[in-house]
Regions:
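Bergerat-fold GHKL ATPase/HATPase_c domain
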Residues: 466-521
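Conserved ATP-binding N-box helix of the HATPase_c
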Residues: 514-539
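Glycine-rich/acidic phosphate-handling loop/turn and adjacent ATP-lid/helix
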Residues: 553-581
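Small-residue-rich hydrophobic transmembrane alpha-helices
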Residues: 72-132, 173-182, 188-189, 296-354, ...
C-alpha cells in the first residue's frame, strides 16, 4: 500500500532541496554556443600571442647570426627599458579592456567609452614623453645597465634609443590589441600583430643585411612594423560590432581611469617586477658568471617566450571573455571557459616540451651557438630549464583568471613572487650551489627558475586558502546566483514550442505567479522566434536563462546570429516586421542589449 502522506512529504523536501541547490532538471545548457565562440577566440589568440612574442625572438635570432652573440646579449640587457616603454600600453590596455568587459556585461556603454577614450589619450601622452627623453637619456641608461664601457654598452644604447623614440606607437598598438579582443574583434587584433611582425621580419633582414644600421635597425624594424600595420584599426573604427566610441572628455572624466589601473594592478605589478627581474637577473648573471652566462640565459629566456607565444594566446582568451561573463554573473560559463583553456594549453605545452627535449641542440644553433663548449653548456641548461614551464603555465593561468574576476590581490601576489621575490634569491642560490658542483654555475640559472615556479604555486594555494576560507580554486560559485532555469535549444522553429512549456513548468514548481510566469514565457518565445527567423545562417544555438531572485524575474537570451539590437528596432517595412519585439518591450519592466563575445546578449526583467 502506498503511503501518500510520506510521498507528499518526500516530494516537498525534494522541491526545497532543488531550491537550495539550483534547478538540476532545468540546468540543461549544453554550452555548445559558448564553446563555439571560445574556439573562435583561440586561434586569433594564439596568432596574437605568437606575433607579439615573435618580434623579440626574430630580433634575437637575426642579431645573433647577422651581427654577433654580444649584440644578442644587448637585446636582453635592454629588457628593463623595453619593459618601462611598454608599461602604459600593456597595463592600461589589459586593465582597461577587463574593466570595459565588466562594464559591458552590466550594459554600461557610456562609462566603457569614457574609459576607452581616457586610456587612449594617457597612453599617447606618456609615449610622447618617452620620445622626448630618448636622445638625452639613452647613453646614461645604457651605462647603468652595462657598466664598463664595452661594445655591449654601445649596442644596448643604440637599441634602447629607438625603443624610446617609438614609445607612442608601441603603447597605442599594445593597448588597442587588448581592446579589440573584448570588442568582438579578436581576429583583427591577431592580424594586426601578425602583419606588424611580418613587416618587422622583412625590415630586420633588410636593415641588418644591407645597411650599416646594425642593432639600431633591429629596434627600428619593430617600431615601423607596429606603425605600418595600424591602418588595420580603420576596419575597427568602421565596424558595426563596436560598443566603444571616442568621446569628448572633461578633466574630471579622467578619474575613470582608476578603473583600468585597479583592474590592471596585476599587470602593473608584472611590468614593475619584470623591470626588477630583468635588471636583477642581468646583474646577478653578469657578476656571478659573465657574458657566457648571459648568452645562455638569453637562449633559455627566448625558449620561454616560445612557450608564451603558443600557450599565452590560449590563456589570453580568459581576460577577453571571463570579464564579460563575470559582469553577467554567468559563473557556469566561467567554469566552462577555464576548463577548456587549461585543457588546450597543456596539450600544446606537452608538444612544446617534447620538441625542445628532442631538438635542443638545433635550437641553440638557431640562436647563434657554434656547437663548441658554450653550445654544450646551452644544451645542458636548456634541458633543465624546460621543466619550469609546467608550473609556469599554471601560474600564468592564475594571474589571467583572478584579475578577470576582480581578485587582483591574488593575481598580484603570484606576479610579485614569480618575477622578483622568489626568482632573484632562487637564481642567485642556484648559481652559487651549482658553481660549487661544476665550477661554472650556468645550470643554476635553470634550477632557480624551476624552484621559483614551484614555490609560487605552493605559496599561492596557501594565500588563497587564507584569504578565502573553504573556497574552491575558482572562488566564484559553481552555479549562477538565484534559482535558475538554464537550457539551450537549436535554432529551429520546432524547438520554440518547448521554450514556453519549460518556463511555465519551472515557474509553477517555484511558486511564481501565473501572470509573471506567462510574461516570461511569452517574452522568451517571441524573442527566440525572432532570432530563428532573422538570425541568419550563423545562428545555430540559443541559450536561455531564467533567473529568480527575490521579487525579480530576469530572462537572458544569448545567440550567435547576425547583429540585432532589439532596443533600436523600429518597424520599417512589411518585409521585415517583427511585431514580437514591440510586445516584449510593452510587457517587460526593462530590456538591455549588448553585442559581447561576438554574440547577441539580451536581458529582459519583469
Amino acid at each position: 500500500m502506498i503511503n501518500y502522506k510520506k510521498r507528499r512529504k518526500y516530494q516537498k523536501n525534494q522541491l526545497i532541496l532543488k531550491d537550495l541547490k539550483g534547478d538540476e532538471k532545468g540546468n540543461m545548457r549544453n554550452n555548445r554556443l559558448l564553446n563555439h565562440k571560445l574556439n573562435k577566440y583561440i586561434i586569433p589568440g594564439i596568432m596574437m600571442s605568437l606575433a607579439l612574442q615573435l618580434g623579440n625572438i626574430v630580433d634575437t635570432i637575426f642579431v645573433s647570426n647577422l651581427i654577433s652573440v654580444d649584440a644578442m646579449s644587448a637585446v636582453t640587457m635592454s629588457l628593463p627599458v623595453e619593459t618601462v616603454v611598454q608599461l602604459t600600453g600593456y597595463c592600461l590596455g589589459i586593465g582597461g579592456s577587463i574593466a570595459v568587459g565588466n562594464m559591458l556585461g552590466r550594459r554600461d556603454k557610456e562609462s566603457a567609452s569614457k574609459l576607452f577614450s581616457a586610456t587612449f589619450l594617457v597612453t599617447l601622452v606618456v609615449g610622447m614623453i618617452f620620445s622626448l627623453c630618448a636622445f638625452p637619456t639613452a647613453e646614461p641608461i645604457a651605462r647603468i645597465l652595462v657598466p664598463g664601457g664595452s661594445i655591449l654598452t654601445d649596442y644596448t644604447r643604440d637599441y634602447i634609443r629607438i625603443s624610446m623614440l617609438g614609445a607612442p606607437v608601441i603603447g597605442i598598438g599594445l593597448m588597442m590589441v587588448n581592446y579589440l579582443g573584448v570588442e568582438n574583434h579578436p581576429e583583427l587584433a591577431s592580424i594586426y600583430l601578425v602583419l606588424a611582425n611580418v613587416i618587422n621580419l622583412v625590415l630586420d633582414y633588410i636593415f641588418l643585411r644591407f645597411t650599416p644600421l646594425g642593432i639600431t635597425g633591429a629596434s627600428l624594424s619593430t617600431v615601423l612594423g607596429f606603425l605600418f600595420a595600424m591602418f588595420l584599426f580603420l576596419f575597427y573604427v568602421r565596424s558595426d560590432k563596436r560598443n566603444l566610441h571616442f568621446v569628448r572628455l572633461k578633466v574630471k572624466d579622467f578619474v575613470i581611469i582608476k578603473e583600468a589601473i585597479v583592474t590592471g594592478i596585476p599587470m602593473l605589478v608584472f611590468m614593475a617586477t619584470s623591470f626588477v627581474k630583468a635588471l636583477g637577473l642581468n646583474t646577478i648573471i653578469m657578476n656571478q658568471i659573465g657574458e657566457e652566462g648571459m648568452a645562455v640565459f638569453t637562449v633559455c629566456d627566448n625558449v620561454l617566450l616560445i612557450v608564451e607565444m603558443l600557450t599565452g594566446g590560449i590563456i589570453g582568451v580568459i581576460p577577453n571573455v571571463a570579464g564579460i561573463l563575470f559582469g553577467e554573473k554567468d559563473y557556469v560559463g566561467i567554469h566552462v571557459l577555464c576548463k577548456k583553456m587549461l585543457k588546450y594549453s597543456y596539450l600544446v605545452l606537452a608538444m612544446v616540451f617534447i620538441f625542445v627535449m628532442t631538438f635542443t641542440g638545433q635550437i641553440t644553433i638557431l640562436f647563434g651557438s657554434d656547437g663548441g663548449e658554450l653550445g654544450t653548456q646551452m644544451v645542458h641548461a636548456l634541458r633543465i630549464f624546460i621543466f619550469c614551464v609546467v608550473p609556469y603555465l599554471w601560474n600564468k593561468f592564475i594571474v589571467s583568471y583572478y584579475e578577470s574576476i576582480e581578485e587582483t590581490t591574488i593575481a598580484s601576489f603570484v606576479t610579485f613572487l614569480e618575477n622578483a621575490v622568489a626568482l632573484l634569491p632562487a637564481t642567485f642560490t642556484g648559481i652559487y650551489i651549482w658553481k660549487k658542483v661544476d665550477g661554472i654555475g650556468i645550470n643554476g640559472i635553470a634550477a632557480g627558475f624551476i624552484a621559483t615556479e614551484i614555490i609560487t604555486v605552493a605559496a599561492t594555494w596557501i594565500f588563497r586558502k587564507i584569504k578565502h576560507k573553504n573556497s574552491t580554486f575558482y572562488i566564484v560559485p559553481d552555479k549562477n546566483p538565484g534559482i535558475n532555469l538554464d537550457f539551450s535549444i537549436r535554432s529551429s522553429m520546432d524547438e520554440t514550442q518547448n521554450v514556453h512549456r519549460k518556463i511555465i513548468e519551472f515557474c509553477r514548481e517555484r511558486g511564481v505567479s501565473a501572470n509573471k510566469a506567462n510574461l516570461a514565457a511569452v517574452c522568451a518565445e517571441e524573442m527566440t522566434v525572432n532570432i530563428i527567423k532573422y538570425g541568419g545562417k550563423t545562428s545555430n544555438w540559443i541559450d536561455i536563462n531564467l533567473c529568480l531572485e527575490e521579487d525579480l524575474c530576469r530572462l537572458r537570451i544569448r545567440d550567435n546570429g547576425i547583429i540585432f539590437n532589439p532596443l533600436e528596432y523600429k518597424h520599417d517595412s512589411e518585409e521585415f516586421d517583427i511585431h514580437g519585439i514591440e510586445l516584449v518591450k510593452k510587457i517587460s519592466k526593462s530590456m538591455d542589449y549588448i553585442r559581447a563575445i561576438d554574440m547577441n546578449n539580451t536581458i529582459i526583467s519583469f
